[in-house]
Amino acid sequence: MVSPNKLPIVKSAARHACLQRFSRSGLPSKLPIAKKCGGSEVRFVRMRQRAVEIFQHAFCVGVFRVLLQLRGKAGAHAAGHPALPRGEYQLSQHVGERCVYTFCMCPGGQVVASASEEGRVVTNGMSYHARSGKNANAAVVVSVNGTDFANDPRQAIAFQRELEAKAYAAGRAAGPYAAPAENIRSFLEGKGQLHIGSVEPTYDRGVTAADLGSLLPAELADTLRAGLRAYEHKIAGYTAPDAILTGLETRTSSPVRLKREENFECTQLAGLYPCGEGAGYAGGIMSAAVDGLRVARAIISRYAPAEG
């Protein structure tokens, strides 16, 4: 295993200086890497060049579905009662060898911009504490497997970035970082139409009509359609004509995973602790926080004074 003092992780002055300061002060040189998922391809390539082992990791891509919050409670007993909290749901459907499922369901929420690179569009969802927005939204995504890219992490990263660039180009007519969108029925029929009625888009950079199916590989688009049709049988009104799909969601989790040992330390580079979403060990805020806590405890326990 290589020592971090002999092999800089990246050409980042701040991170390299961090290691050097720890070394000179006599403190252990430990550097957790807790990147948000969807990090730059260049950073991952540089890590591979420095002997950090990176694997292709299963992830998902899809769209955000927006519908009135009242409809989000459809099918629930006493839906709309003031004593009840905002309705939530979690759905999944196997379609052939893939799975379509909902992710990041946000009652009373909105769709937000989450791009981390220029010339790319990424959507995400959130709710404020009161969950008082009139819309409910959730990502509807389809699984992407290692076999889709011959288990090559570089191909997986390139695919993710290609989709984000397509989304940017499709929404560009409405302004920088506007998102492509269409009504859910339009998506099911492959029409690329957007009519704004009772449901208004919440993506604050603006939206424009686009054929979302054309932004995805045909197999993934068809799988999403099959999943949405199945959801209509589980929640009546799920594919209501006024529901809006906003795209794309490409970062439910990282397309790669940095290899680490049972003690959470990087296999090839001493002192490096991959953790969280970007490293491929979480898929959301809570799971990333829990993984970060586990890594922190591992580092602390390694240097904690012996009891007694």
Would you name each region that the model predicts?
Residues 16-20, 53:
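Residues flanking N-terminal targeting/processing segments that define the start of mature chains
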Residues 5, 11-12, 36-37:
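Polybasic, lysine-rich low-complexity intrinsically disordered segments
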Residues 1, 24, 32-308:
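Residues forming the flavin
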Residues 12-13, 26:
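Intrinsic disorder/low-complexity segments enriched in small, polar and charged residues
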